[in-house]
């Protein structure tokens, strides 16, 4: 597995993976509009987005971040791992890469917004605290980098 900066050539495979990941969690599969144009919604704004690619050149995970304007804080966005690839360290590797890039850009606080109802976000509610995040208000967690 390798983690790379988003490339348009993987766009459709990423979208397919995200829809599968949502379906596996029992959510109605729908695509987040920002993922339809990662370049405009992340790179053109000075933010970042990564893909996890397997040995068959398929997308098995993704995630990115967007800086909160005029602060040293950023939000982690769209951290997904293909359902059949979970519990193999892919999400942790993506988060580590995201946080490393944040630090390089002078970001000191990483935040994440959890969806609702909370029961549908049980994996996120367990994942982020294992990586040093703590809830600071309902549905939000943060970590000092």
Predicted features, each with a name:
Residues 1-2:
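Extreme N-terminal starter segment of soluble prokaryotic enzymes
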Residues 5-77, 82, 95, 101, ...:
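Acetyl-CoA-dependent GNAT
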Residues 81, 87-100, 126, 130:
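Conserved acetyl-CoA-binding loop-helix of GNAT-fold acetyltransferases
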Residues 86, 111-124, 142-145:
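Conserved beta-strand-loop-alpha-helix junction that forms the acyl-donor binding cleft
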Residues 90, 107, 133:
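Short phosphate-binding/catalytic loops that engage adenosine nucleotides
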Residues 95, 102-116:
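Conserved GNAT acetyl-CoA-binding A-motif
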Residues 130, 134, 139-145:
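Terminal substrate-recognition subdomain of acyl/acetyltransferases
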